[in-house]
A protein has these predicted regions:
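Surface-exposed beta-strand edges and their flanking turn/coil or helix-capping segments
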Residues: 18-20, 93, 114-116, 129-133, ...
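Short hydrophobic-aromatic micro-motifs
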Residues: 5, 114-118, 125
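Short, charged/polar low-complexity linear motifs in solvent-exposed/disordered segments
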Residues: 31, 67-68, 113, 133-135, ...
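Active-site-proximal loop/helix segment associated with metal-binding centers of metalloenzymes
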Residues: 120-183
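Generic hydrophobic, helix-prone segments enriched in Leu/Val/Ile
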Residues: 50, 183-184
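Core catalytic region of metal-dependent phosphoesterases/phosphodiesterases
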Residues: 2, 6, 11-110
Length: 184
């Protein structure tokens, strides 16, 4: 049996030209590994935005979620690390399919090898702004306040923020490239 890893699918992201095609590609990959997989570890940002309200989960991702359920029903362990885009994943996936949610980095022995696992934002804390936002997002009171806002508003806001953040990051990368800062 094998253990598989995947990260940063950003399902539902507005920067994907065809979000459904990305989801279908991920489902095809899961289909291709289901015969020999004993566990699948998703290392964060499965979704571009995920917030679980008490009785509401995000629209979409049906093929992917159905495939996860199928794999879990086959006895394949599903591990999901929280990323900075799906930080508000709570108990829906553990209750529905038995997924194991990891909120922090983890050192684990798998098949006789030691791994340090987590999402990248859990490893690199250089940005003070990111640390502040992360603390706000993880604060129970702030989560409670946010949950009081209708999903119609929060989802549009979050997906727009994500898209703008990505564009800003790409612009900074291009500026560094232009200035030669990425030269080896």
């Amino acid at each position: 049996m094998k253990i598989y890893f995947a990260s940063d699918a950003h399902l539902g992201a507005r920067f994907h030209k065809d979000p459904l095609a990305i989801e279908k590609k991920l489902v095809r990959w899961l289909d291709s590994i289901k015969e020999d997989a004993s566990a699948i570890w998703f290392l964060g940002d499965l979704f571009d935005y995920w917030y679980e309200y008490k009785y509401v989960v995000p629209k979409g991702h049906v093929r992917f979620l159905g495939k996860l359920a199928e794999l879990a029903d086959r006895g394949i362990e599903i591990h999901i690390f929280i990323g900075n885009h799906d930080i508000w994943m709570f108990d829906y996936l553990p209750k529905e399919i038995g997924a194991i949610i990891h909120r922090d980095t983890l050192t684990v022995d798998l098949l006789g090898k030691r791994f340090f696992l987590g999402h990248g934002d859990e490893v690199d804390f250089r940005s003070k702004a990111f640390r502040l936002i992360r603390a706000i997002f993880r604060n129970k009171f702030c989560q409670w306040l946010y949950a009081g806002i209708h999903p119609r508003w929060t989802f549009g806001f979050a997906l727009g923020w994500s898209l703008n953040s990505r564009k800003s990051g790409l612009e900074k990368q291009e500026a560094k490239k232009y200035q030669g800062e990425d030269a080896k």
